[in-house]
Amino acid sequence: FIPHMKSQKNGKIAVISSIASFRGLPHHSAYSGSKAAVRNICQGWQSALKKHRVSVTAVCPGFIKSEMTDSNNFYMPFLMNTDVAANKIIRAVDRRKKVYIFPWQMRLLAIPILKYAPDWIINKFSL
C-alpha cells in the first residue's frame, strides 16, 4: 500500500503504539519496548514519506476496553470504549497528527510522569 500512496502523492497511515511506549515498565518491558519500537519506526516513516504527502500517525492510546484489557487485573484509569477511541483515532489521522496521545488526561498527566519520574516511583506503582 505504501508504493501506491507514494505514486498517488497522497495517503494517511495509522500505526498503534501505546502510552506505555514512553518508558520501559517493570513486568511489562516486552510490551512497552515493542510499542516504543513501533513509535520510532513511525518517526522514520514520517521523514521518508513526507515528500510524497503520505502522513504517518503514531497512535498512543491509554486503556481501551477490549479482550486484552478484559484480562487485566489492575486499575485502568480513564478506560475508554472502543467506538469512542476509534473516532478519536480517525480524527487524528485525518488531521495528519504525527503522534496522537489520548485520552487528554493521560497526555497531560501520565506522559510527564512516565518520562521523568525516578525509577523508585515507577517501581512502587508497577504491578
Residue ranges and their predicted role:
Residues 14, 56-59, 69, 89:
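Hydrophobic structural elements of the Rossmann-like NAD(P)H-binding subdomain
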Residues 61-71, 75:
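Short, flexible catalytic-loop segment of classical short-chain dehydrogenase/reductase
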